[in-house]
Each structure stands twice: as C-alpha cells, then as structure tokens.
Swiss-Prot record:
It comes from the Bacteria. It holds the Pfam family FMN_bind. One of its GO terms (cellular component) is plasma membrane. The modification FMN phosphoryl threonine is found at T174. HAMAP family: RsxG_RnfG. GO terms for molecular function: electron transfer activity; FMN binding; oxidoreductase activity, acting on NAD(P)H. This is Ion-translocating oxidoreductase complex subunit G. Keywords: Cell inner membrane, Cell membrane, Electron transport, Flavoprotein, FMN, Membrane, Phosphoprotein, Translocase, Transmembrane, Transmembrane helix, Transport.
Length: 206
C-alpha cells in the first residue's frame, strides 16, 4: 500500500514538473511570436512613412527619446535612419493636441532638409464619417504629405485651403485636417534640428 502511494506520488510530481516545464515553454514561444509580430508591424508602418531604399540600418534599434514641444507634450520616440552609418532622415512620433475630439497621434517620416517623406495616423478619436478621413483605410488624404517641402515656420503652403494653404479640408470638418497639417509641419521642422543633437539624446530603454 505504502509503495503504491509512493509510486503514485512520484508519478504526480513528475507530471506536475513536466506540465510546468511545458507551460513555461509555450509561454516563451508565445512571447517570442508576439514580439516578432509586433516588430513586423512596426517595420511595415515605418515603410509607409520612410522609403526603405533611403536607409540601410536597423531603424527600430536606432531609437531615441526626445522631449520637444514641437512634437507635443511628454516624451516621443524618434528613429534615426542611416545610410552607411550617416544619418539621413528620421521617423518621429508626434501629437496633434488640437483635434476635434482630442489628441491625434502621428508617425512622420522626414529628411533633414525640410522634406516630409510620409505620414500616418496611429491613434485618434475623431468623428466617424467626418474627421476620421485622416485614416488611410478611409481616404488617401494622409498620403498627400509625402514629398512636400517645408520652407520655414512661416511657409504659408502648410495650411488647409480654407486658411490659404495647399491641403484640402474635409466637408464639414476643418479642425481635424488643420490639426494634422500643423503637427506634421512642426515635426518636419523639428527633424531638421536632429543631426546637431543626436549625441546628447538618450537612447530608448536607457
């Protein structure tokens, strides 16, 4: 009887140990898969705002944290694109604080000479059917920033047409596109200041 109990106890202990090990292995595999998927999604988003042929470094690993009013309140990530180890452009997180329904989060690609290479909205709460046309899945409006040059803080072209600029507003919704245009302009201007301050910026994760 005692031998049987001991035998069953050992079997249960081995089973428990095996189950724990299997669970840990599955959890680790799941974490790895999630991390890989997140990395692929991030790269796909980068490719939408910065042409891949313009750089040859690992963009996600060239990440810096900046606190700059031009990008919005708090810290924002900036990714420096390099060609043969020479900084050539940046992908910047930026916030348009003055959307119709609150802050609009953006990703802006820009070189250091004042040209915006691409823009995408990553988060917003704008009105469906009106301000949400800033989303690529609903309209190509957001793609019209690519290739646009900023000639300085007073560049009148960088405004919606209602304000005398070059960018369309939406029917029944001017506040949202105005907020995005202004935020992209600020980010593009800020990008020009990055080369001079790279050595002082903290890396992401520090």
């Amino acid at each position: 009887m005692l031998k049987t109990i001991r035998k069953h106890g050992i079997t249960l202990a081995l089973f428990a140990a095996g189950s724990t090990g299997l669970t840990a292995a599955i959890n680790q595999m799941t974490k790895t898969t999630i991390a890989e998927q997140a990395s692929l999604q991030q790269k796909a988003l980068f490719d939408q705002v910065l042409p891949a042929e313009r750089y040859n470094n690992a963009l996600a690993q060239s990440c810096y944290l900046v606190t700059a009013p031009e990008l919005g309140k708090g810290e924002h990530r900036v990714y420096i694109a390099k060609q043969d180890d020479k900084p050539v452009a940046a992908v910047l997180e930026a916030t348009a604080p003055d959307g119709y329904s609150g802050a609009i989060q953006l990703l802006v690609g820009a070189d250091f000479n004042g040209t915006v290479l691409g823009t995408r909205v990553t988060e917003h709460h704008e009105t469906p059917g009106l301000g949400d046309k800033i989303e690529l899945r609903l309209s190509d409006w957001i793609t019209h920033f690519a290739g646009k040059k900023i000639s300085g803080a007073d560049d009148a072209h960088w405004a919606v047409k209602k304000d005398g600029g070059d960018f369309d507003q939406f029917t029944g919704a001017t506040i949202t596109p105005r907020a995005v245009v202004n935020a992209v302009k600020r980010a593009g201007l800020y990008a020009q200041t990055l080369p001079a301050q790279l050595s002082q910026l903290p890396a992401c994760g520090e």
